[in-house]
Amino acid sequence: MGKIKKLPEHVIGKIAAGEVVAGPYSVVKELVENSLDAGATKIEIEIKSGGKSYIKVKDNGEGMGREDLLLSIYEHTTSKINDFDDIYNLSSFGFRGEALASIAKVSRIVITSNNGSESHRLEAIGGKIKSVNEYPLVEKGTIVEVYDLFFNVPARRKFLKSEATEKRYVVEYVEKFLLSNPDVEFIFRADNEIIYNARASNLEERFKLIFPEVKEYTLINGKYVEGIISSPNYHRKNRTGQIFFVQKRFVMDKMLYYIFENGYGEALVDHPYGVLFINVPSKLVDVNVHPQKLEVKFSNPNIIYSDITRTVREALKKFVSKQIFVKPINEKKTKSEVSSFETKNVNFSNDSFQDKFNSVFKESVNHVDYSKNMLFDISEKNLEVKNDVVILKKRYVLFEMEDGIYIMDFHAAHERVIYEQILEKLKVGIEKIDLIIPIEIKVGKSLKQIVIEKLDELKENGFEIKVENESVKILSIPSFIKPSDVDDIFKEIIDEYRIPSMGTKNMKHIIADKACKSAVRTGYDITEGEAKKLIEEVFKRNLTTCPHGRPLFLKITFNEIDKYFDRT
């Protein structure tokens, strides 16, 4: 008998469901999209236990009759398209006929619907209909209730996150619907707590609701893009404040992130906030390239990208008095931008000098082994700095050691030393400062959920916090953090946890990383004495990179210098 065999239908169904249903948040996503496609103007969402045990979505849409209700939980049944070409003229969210079918296969589901002339309730377990009966539903619309998600796929259920984390994922997705559909009323409850009660309004009001920390923003309106963006003064360390929609579908597209930030040009600090709606004719965009429709393809992307950059740049004139330099989208770095030495002011009559220098310099740089995150072993060096140090462009320190010449980035070095000092304090025990006046920080709902998730861990690391409805109050802080820095540092610490890959990162390292921002900056007038002390501290601790992995030193050995001067 051959080794290849056809999988049973129930196995195929569960595997396929996994492509659509990643967790409670994706159930909410699919059900809310169905409600919007049904023309709902009011949608109520409720979850319990992070959505693991119960999810409910109720709408006032057009509803379904008995015949449609029976077909709704079977795969590839849809009212949106008739043949493949219809995909390129879509105005709805759903079209594959997979969502309800996939959800039904991995849960116990109850659907109650009234289309204005008849009302029925369907109950199914694991994708199999158990009953369909007439049911008195007073209001026109549909109620979908999902119980015990992944009850029949224990391996998938095992990999769900904690209830608090799954709840946060749902909150974040609900926020995307609030932004993309400001004209729809949303009520969202979690474990009997009202998270959002958002009346129909407009984008500006919804933006303020989701991002209360942003005080400077402006609406934008281009040929293909519209939305709302923050001033350069408001930004995050990651792109969680950037939410993009194409035809009102939420998308995650690296190129769109880049193009948006490109519009900020030289005004860019970190990652600004932005809610963008890209509107193009349906036939010019393909949404059928990702199982969860998170990616899109444009038939002519350059005109879209140019419009985004131009529109953002024009809008920012409201905030930035000086002219913003916007790099061309496809601009490549020139040699002068990537070279470690500037040579434009040096005029050598003999080109061979520069060629020879570049050859030796390249050889010294090639000694760096980034894979080991180590430039060279400094643990056994004589820590004495020979002669005086030289400060270069208020950025670098040049000094001589026994084996060569070193150039050190003093900001990166100071940052790493502070990072190590803070880690040492955190490991020994936290010394806290009780604040006479608590520091109140405005946060959105999803950030508040992260604080709740990490409350105990934050307390262990020196932050005493009281969570309130629209804000968090910080009652005590670690002694090494200045009260004036608390707002920025705390937001950055919490923001780290919005990125799933950061969830496993030790909070002590995150706090140390953020707190070391007090390091001297490039441009600081560092004295020779300060520079020598910093060099000694770095060598004593055997440090070679900053907390983010960038090298602290460039080293050119005397052997390499001798080689250049033909003294070998």
UniProtKB/Swiss-Prot annotation:
Domain of life (superkingdom): Bacteria
Which GO annotations describe the biological process of this protein? Answer: mismatch repair
Which UniProt keywords are given for this protein, alphabetically ordered? DNA damage, DNA repair
* Molecular function terms from GO: ATP binding; ATP hydrolysis activity; ATP-dependent DNA damage sensor activity; mismatched DNA binding
Q: Does the keyword Manganese apply?
A: no
Q: Which family does it belong to?
A: Belongs to the DNA mismatch repair MutL/HexB family.
Write down what this protein is called.
Answer: DNA mismatch repair protein MutL
- Output the Gene Ontology cellular-component terms: mismatch repair complex
Please describe what this protein does.
Answer: This protein is involved in the repair of mismatches in DNA. It is required for dam-dependent methyl-directed DNA mismatch repair. May act as a 'molecular matchmaker', a protein that promotes the formation of a stable complex between two or more DNA-binding proteins in an ATP-dependent manner without itself being part of a final effector complex.
A matching Pfam family: HATPase_c_3
